[in-house]
């Protein structure tokens, strides 16, 4: 979950009621269908189906690339994945999404922070292998597809019943704090740690913090990118960066895909794995689907279009789900809709789908530049640690904001029990073995919250 995911989680809950009223449509939208519009919160210069002049369009597309870049590369760097694959998957995923939605929604898909904790734990439990992590994200994408079919057939009331704020809030907190120890270790705040690494982490943290609090305009949209660049330059000055990988890399290289079959050595291989480590990743879909609804509601208000009606929530979920499965199949992280790019649309007042499409093509091109991706791989762990301290903390804090914004009443014992059980089980290292399936961490926390919410009787104030 990136800063974009953090912000959109806040928007998701207080706008959910509006979103639920906007959900209709079909998987196949006839070309003759009347475009459904509402009052826009922004006076757009270019609407969704309009195109800018060629040169202006290229510049606008690069602006979207800059907006998504910091968060998109940070996820694979934290997880130890090839950055080139994440860039490739974000570009392909965006094009898949646009195809599924009939090129009607100006959304960019990038790496999702929500899955970092679960994927990292799956890798750790598998001895560093990515089998469970990649399989879990592939299946998560398929869950999106199933939910899309469910929305098409049965509407959305069942989603709202499963995902009240008292479940969503604690789950976000568990996701945010699940890897707090890893962030502290990477930052160098451990016994015997190098003071240089700790100093780099502090500088990186402060750059991101100041930009988030004082930045204006476009600077406010890309705090991750500026923080990574600033921390990296500082690390270079302290002699913590090794440029040998950049010197050895080719200018043009095929992205370092991981594939679930033997390619004769052309690419690395992982095996599809359906064990408990894989199952533990699936409940993350609960949070990301809710965020998906919130993101599209906000974008609908900016563009003055009811995207949850046309092309419909089922089609946007379908595109997001297929894109996520394809990314994981290729060895990349999960994809998600990016609020940073929605912010760019609000700032530039240009909602042209063609601009987003060209940004996706630029990301695809960057994934083949070997020197470029090698340079990114030289970013020290201390830079990532400084970013992660802020990132994980903000994610957890926004779980609290969800509870506050939705006015979850903790004077009611029912709500107190649900949140307490989720937090203790999610952060306390609890595991539950049910035959061949073992639930732990985020998965156990999510299932506990959902079950308690369904079975505990409601109280009156």
Question: Whereabouts are the PLM-identified features?
Answer:
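Hydrophobic transmembrane alpha-helices of multi-pass solute/ion transporters
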Residues: 36, 42, 207-210, 225-281, ...
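Membrane-embedded alpha-helical modules
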Residues: 126-242, 358-461
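Short, non-helical or kinked segments that cap or interrupt transmembrane helices
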Residues: 81-86, 103-115, 159-168, 220-225, ...
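N-terminal signal-anchor module of multipass membrane proteins
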Residues: 30-107, 114-126
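Hydrophobic, membrane-embedded alpha-helices of multi-pass small-molecule transporters
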Residues: 55-71, 196-204, 222-223, 238, ...
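Membrane-embedded helical hairpins/re-entrant loop segments and their flanking transmembrane helices
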Residues: 32, 42-55, 77-98, 280-353
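Juxtamembrane interface elements at the cytosolic ends of transmembrane helices
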Residues: 41, 69-70, 204-214, 222, ...
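Intrinsically disordered, low-complexity non-transmembrane regions of multi-pass membrane transporters
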Residues: 2-59, 245-266, 301-302, 308, ...
């Amino acid at each position: 979950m990136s800063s974009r995911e953090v912000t959109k989680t806040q928007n998701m809950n207080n706008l959910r009621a509006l979103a639920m009223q906007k959900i209709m449509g079909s998987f196949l939208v006839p070309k003759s269908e009347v475009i459904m519009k509402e009052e826009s919160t922004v006076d757009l210069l270019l609407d969704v189906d309009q195109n800018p002049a060629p040169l202006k369009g290229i510049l606008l597309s690069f602006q979207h690339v800059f907006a998504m870049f910091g968060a998109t590369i940070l996820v694979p760097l934290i997880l130890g994945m090839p950055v080139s694959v994440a860039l490739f998957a974000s570009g392909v995923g965006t094009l898949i999404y646009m195809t599924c939605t009939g090129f009607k929604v100006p959304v960019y898909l990038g790496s999702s922070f929500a899955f970092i904790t679960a994927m990292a734990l799956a890798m750790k439990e598998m001895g560093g292998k990515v089998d469970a992590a990649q399989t879990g994200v592939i299946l998560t994408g398929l869950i999106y597809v199933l939910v899309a079919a469910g929305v098409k057939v049965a509407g959305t009331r069942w989603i709202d019943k499963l995902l009240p704020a008292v479940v969503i809030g604690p789950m976000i907190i568990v996701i945010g704090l699940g890897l707090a120890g890893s962030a502290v270790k990477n930052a160098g705040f451990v016994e015997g740690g190098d003071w240089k690494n700790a100093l780099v982490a502090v500088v990186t943290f402060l750059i991101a913090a100041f930009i988030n609090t004082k930045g204006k305009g476009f600077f406010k949209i890309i705090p991750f990118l500026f923080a990574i660049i600033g921390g990296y330059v500082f690390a270079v000055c302290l002699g913590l960066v090794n440029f040998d990988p950049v010197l050895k890399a080719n200018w043009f290289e095929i992205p370092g895909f991981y594939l679930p079959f033997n390619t004769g050595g052309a690419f690395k291989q992982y095996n599809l794995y359906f064990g408990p480590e894989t199952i533990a990743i699936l409940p993350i879909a609960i949070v990301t689907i809710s965020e998906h609804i919130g993101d599209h509601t906000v974008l609908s208000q900016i563009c003055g279009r009811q995207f949850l009606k046309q092309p419909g929530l089922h089609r946007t979920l379908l595109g997001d789900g297929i894109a996520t499965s394809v990314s994981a199949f290729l060895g990349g992280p999960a994809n998600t809709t990016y609020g940073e790019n929605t912010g760019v649309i609000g700032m530039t007042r240009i909602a042209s789908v063609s601009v987003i499409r060209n940004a996706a093509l630029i990301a695809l091109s960057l994934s083949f530049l070997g020197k470029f991706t090698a340079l990114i791989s030289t970013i020290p762990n201390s830079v990532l640690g400084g970013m992660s301290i802020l990132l994980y903390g903000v994610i957890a804090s926004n779980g609290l904001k969800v509870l506050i914004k939705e006015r979850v009443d903790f004077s009611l014992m029912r709500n107190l029990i649900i949140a307490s059980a989720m937090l203790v089980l999610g952060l306390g290292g609890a595991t539950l073995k049910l035959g061949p399936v073992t639930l732990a961490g985020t998965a156990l926390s999510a299932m506990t919250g959902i079950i308690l919410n369904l079975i505990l009787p409601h109280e009156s104030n």
